[in-house]
């Protein structure tokens, strides 16, 4: 995996998934040069999708993309059997890979993580990207575990690293050749400078062209040009997590007239003060005109 992979929102309309809006968003992203899309992840509100909706969203994304870019579907769960079922379904309908979040809440040991990811890797053939996000799962995939999984299973090829500790990123990249993608927009350039390959991005939902340019510059070693784009977009990056993701990005998309719609409870609309800050930031960077 290399480049920009937007973690796409799941647009809703009147309480149901807005598939027409989903197609519109995907076309916009592809037209602006992204490497692939990641449906039904954190940004896609996967915890509030029913299992049937989860599968149908993946199916529709594969259909809409139609081979133009990669589709890496979020199929993780804190139940190994459920993650396996989602992953096998995604493989059967033609995804290019799956993204597996660390099991959350039940907090397995590192040995449990090895067995969890290993069982899924042994049961599917498509590439697997691990997803490490300790702030949400209360559990870190340790560098030694990442190295073990990469070396033991040929289809574990990448990791979305949302642990902001760059020492961890350094340890991982120093120990094995797994593709590391930043899971935080604001850490994209530091991670690429250490040997990472790109980003699973939230902000790319609204600024794909700029983010693709930034990552392309960075991967080409042109960090001065990459930094210009980073600092231009930084006011928005900061606000993407002022409230729980995907509240800010869906709010921004609604402001920009993009298909996004409402949030599903327990997520709710953005506080008015934060909404005003977001509107001002979108104006400042020239996205809202």
UniProtKB/Swiss-Prot annotation:
Pyruvate binds at residues 43, 200. Keywords: Amino-acid biosynthesis, Cytoplasm, Diaminopimelate biosynthesis, Lyase, Lysine biosynthesis, Schiff base. The record marks 42, 105 as: Part of a proton relay during catalysis. Gene3D superfamilies: Aldolase class I (3.20.20.70). It is found in: Cytoplasm. One of its GO terms (molecular function) is 4-hydroxy-tetrahydrodipicolinate synthase activity. The active site is at residues 131, 160. It catalyses: L-aspartate 4-semialdehyde + pyruvate = (2S,4S)-4-hydroxy-2,3,4,5-tetrahydrodipicolinate + H2O + H(+). Its main location: cytoplasm. GO terms for biological process: diaminopimelate biosynthetic process; lysine biosynthetic process via diaminopimelate. Pathway: Amino-acid biosynthesis; L-lysine biosynthesis via DAP pathway; (S)-tetrahydrodipicolinate from L-aspartate: step 3/4. Pfam families: DHDPS. PROSITE patterns: DHDPS_1 (PS00665), DHDPS_2 (PS00666). One of its GO terms (cellular component) is cytoplasm. Its EC number is 4.3.3.7. Belongs to the DapA family. Homotetramer; dimer of dimers. Catalyzes the condensation of (S)-aspartate-beta-semialdehyde [(S)-ASA] and pyruvate to 4-hydroxy-tetrahydrodipicolinate (HTPA). NCBIfam families: dapA. This is 4-hydroxy-tetrahydrodipicolinate synthase. It comes from Methanococcus maripaludis (strain C5 / ATCC BAA-1333). The lineage of its organism: Archaea, Methanobacteriati, Methanobacteriota, Methanomada group, Methanococci.
